[in-house]
Amino acid sequence: MLARSVRTLVVSPKTVFRFRGCLFEKHVSTASADDRAIVSLFDSPHAAFKYPSTISTGLFGHSQLSHPNAFISLAEATLVRAQLLTDRILRARSSRDELLKVVKNLDRLSDMLCSVIDLAELIRNAHPDRNWATAGHHVYEQLCEFMNVLNTHVGLYEVLKLVLADASIVKTLSPEAYQTALIFWRDFEKSAINLPPEERQKFVSLSSDILVLGREFLENANAPRPPASIKPEHMVGIKDKGLGVRLQLQAQFTRRDLLVYPGSLQAQMIMRSAPDEEPRRRMYIAANSSTDQQIXTLERLLKTRAELARLVGRSSFAHMTLDDKMAKTPENVMNFLGALIGQTRPFARRALKTLSARKQAHHGLSSLPTIQAWDRDFYCPPEPPAPPIPLPPLTLGTIFMGLSRLFKYLYGITLRPTEAQTGEVWHSDVHKLEVIDEDKGLIGWIYADLFARHGKSSGAAHYTVRCSRRTDLDDDLGDGGLTGHEELIQQNLEFEKVKRHKIPNQDGVYQLPLVVLLCEFTRPSVLKGATVLEWHDVMTLFHEMGHAMLAMVGRTEYQNVSGTRCATDFVELPSILMEHFLSSPVVLSLFDLDGTHSLRQVGNTHEDPCHSIDTFSQIILASLDQIYHSPAVLDNSTFSTTDELENLTVSKGVIPHVPSTSFQTQFGHLFGYGATYYSYLFDRAIASRVWKKVFEKDPLKREVGEKYKLEVLRWGGGRDPWKMVSKLLDASELEKGDAEAMREVGRWRIEDEVGLPGRH
């Protein structure tokens, strides 16, 4: 354990503190061997943490996955075993003993397919070898096609209905097993399983149309917008001395209007630096324009979704989607958003008044002018996030060391570097970490693929390649066999048995979780040294590690409710909460290897006035998402996405609507998060409350970490999230998760600077 001692707070801004003694408390950390190993692993240009190994294996320790063709063979083997298990479940109605195993076998069937599908998803996005990536794509498409057949399999649905209708069988199910059964049942119901054949075929057709329209919508969202025509005289006085001067010279030399494309560096410079309002107005309108075809694609997508919902007896796509979420109904979502608007609008208006005063001074006006949409970046230029106190440069290795120390304080869990065997990882940059619990030993693995390279997917991502589940009760022999396919069956069995462990002080054998983190940081080099992260990169790592820790601790008997397999409007809570820890100087002191750095007590007290404006804009977008997936899409013959956006902006917004704009065609989350865009705001509100009420006072206190671990993390998706949150906050009034509970969460101000849109 790291030694702790309390010291008196000294208020003088000139006082210099040791890095290990930030503000109220100091945590003197003697660097352990694991601390030094983890720093060396990520900061050394040659990845110094290496042990000699003569053992050769395949991806993730699966000896058969040593070449792309073997992966395709594994997919074939998986299909054979999945069909055998499907047939077994279908025969269960003739045996009570088999009926008792239906929920377990459905979960096994799901895991059998998902463990290969999730691996394929990673390989096709991260593997540098084109042959592997192609194989990954093939396997993904092949198994997803079979999965879609199972999702609409009437026989499986009828067997599950038989189980849930038998009270004596239901009594034998644990709460976790019953929750798993309900998830399968709801998924079947959403797939029009109980409709006549013709209507089921229509469901399949509409689902296919939605995928096609969704892809087209996303292509349109990312398509370049036409340029804005900027007159030379509008460039006079531009504040940017580099690119701005070049644009002014170009305008003077050509004596013609400049054509500036939205999203370009020139466009960004104009929005932030042009003192004349007109070029900013033109750029804004150009950036938020749409063609009739782009609008038509979105509206066809929304109407097709609405038709799908009506087909299965729901009044709207939002009603269909929210059934199994914390919110439960669109009305509850609007209750939450309405309360959140009431909480946030005063802060947004106060911020706008600050910007209005800046605009008044800029133009020398006698009264406060209106802030327009194109004024935001000029009067409040976007600033990168900053730590709460000045810090020395933070390297990738020190961040992972700090994460390991934080997890040790909170949960008794540490990250331990270990060598990957030859063939186990897809690139030499990938590093392997064991996740070690002080009582239970090894509980999972994290593979960190953190450095940029050609062909690698961009951005940060978290992949749960394999979920946790209990395996000693599987009864593989009961699945039967198939003459002529013995080798394939054995191949899949061997694949499944890797990563299984007996957990000390816990019944049974468990398949341990396996997580991959993908980022694109600069690789350390001999010339430049270790990779130093910007603060937003540190926040991203903490966010993704929140997901990873949920996967590690949420070790359930059923994979369908393990780790991050939980409600969409709950899954971001652990990751957003992790970002809050970065607001604590006490936590930041864990980044110091030996206590050799010093820093000033004076913190970063600058408050971005635009933060509340941006949060309010997110609330408006979440409201728009609900409107776009409401019954009005079909009930109103004149439904127009552009009109709805204008009406919402006029009635609820704080910045005037701009005519001739149609931002909705670039709102890409409408496809991936249709009717659930509120989720991120919802989890931000809960995370803010949890931080304030549970962690802020003493963020490294083990008792607090254990409470969070036991009341939230360990359940994964196997318990009602409302019960978890109400227990954690000692707020019994939330347990019902009704309309009033949603309103109550909406009344919690989102007290953070951590919620960056797009980090999921």
Swiss-Prot record:
GO terms for cellular component: mitochondrial matrix
EC number: 3.4.24.59
Catalytic reaction equation(s): Release of an N-terminal octapeptide as second stage of processing of some proteins imported into the mitochondrion
Cofactor(s) of this protein: Zn(2+)
Source taxon at top rank: Eukaryota
UniProt keywords, alphabetically: Hydrolase, Metal-binding, Metalloprotease, Mitochondrion, Protease, Transit peptide, Zinc
Residues at which Zn(2+) binds: 543, 547
PROSITE patterns on file: ZINC_PROTEASE
Primary localisation category: mitochondrion
UniProt GO MF annotations: metal ion binding; metalloendopeptidase activity
InterPro entries for the chain: M3A_MIP, MetalloPept_cat_dom_sf, Neurolysin/TOP_dom2, Pept_M3A_M3B, Pept_M3A_M3B_dom
Gene3D superfamilies documented for this protein: Collagenase (Catalytic Domain) (3.40.390.10), Neurolysin, domain 3 (1.10.1370.10)
Transit peptide extent on chain: 1-19
Any GO BP annotation: peptide metabolic process
Active site residues per record: 544
Top EC class for this record: hydrolase
Subcellular location(s) of the protein: Mitochondrion matrix
Cited Pfam families: Peptidase_M3
Role according to the record: Cleaves proteins, imported into the mitochondrion, to their mature size. While most mitochondrial precursor proteins are processed to the mature form in one step by mitochondrial processing peptidase (MPP), the sequential cleavage by MIP of an octapeptide after initial processing by MPP is a required step for a subgroup of nuclear-encoded precursor proteins destined for the matrix or the inner membrane.
Family the entry assigns: Belongs to the peptidase M3 family.
Designated name of the protein: Mitochondrial intermediate peptidase
Gene for this chain: OCT1
